[in-house]
């Protein structure tokens, strides 16, 4: 058993868990962390997607009471049926775009310039959204969302296929701009993450199954466990944070991180691959 590899897997798991549900892009951070650790080959890229399962399990645990109540009410209550329908509608655009353009996006957009640009642009969008969104709020609970609202959030989620955008950032900020409260947008983003990230993980593992062996299992399990633990802590913290704070600090972080990516790429401090 390669202890160094397991340590790298644990670090990558922590990075995934801490960044998946904050509006700061887990993909961008995983690219940078992988480059710094020398953990960036084809198998590592599959690993990065697979350990999202740990983060998703954390969300399921945090929201388990709501999920269980919805599942129990699904056969008979319209509110539960509406939520399930809205999640299906929100999930569909990412599935379609991923199947059509996933390989092309991975081949051409995973570059430092793209990652840095989307970090900076995303930060500026958050600053703008936080100024505009509160005045436009019309939806305060998931029960008040309509199918068109869910579809629009699902379309915005597609932007997250560009590395550095942030899936949670796109859906939360997009939801706020569409009229959802910060809490409702965050809740829908986290619920929408469950089918989206599970689907992406299963599809990636299936597509790259030839790269994987039984010997890789300890590495994947280590990453998954650390992803789960760090995501559980992060989601619980974020839900408390948004009750009385805005996303403005994350905007400044994104801008600073984007500038750092440009510097490390141009100086060669981090071996980014163009």
From Swiss-Prot:
Note: Bacitracin is thought to be involved in the inhibition of peptidoglycan synthesis by sequestering undecaprenyl diphosphate, thereby reducing the pool of lipid carrier available.
GO biological process: cell wall organization; peptidoglycan biosynthetic process; regulation of cell shape; response to antibiotic
Identification of the protein by name: Undecaprenyl-diphosphatase
Organism of derivation: Verminephrobacter eiseniae (strain EF01-2)
Family to which this protein belongs: Belongs to the UppP family.
Ranges that cross the membrane: 21-39, 44-64, 85-105, 109-129, 185-205, 214-234, 247-267
GO cellular component, one term: plasma membrane
Catalyzed chemical reaction(s): di-trans,octa-cis-undecaprenyl diphosphate + H2O = di-trans,octa-cis-undecaprenyl phosphate + phosphate + H(+)
Key words of the record: Antibiotic resistance, Cell inner membrane, Cell membrane, Cell shape, Cell wall biogenesis/degradation, Hydrolase, Membrane, Peptidoglycan synthesis, Transmembrane, Transmembrane helix
GO MF term list: undecaprenyl-diphosphatase activity
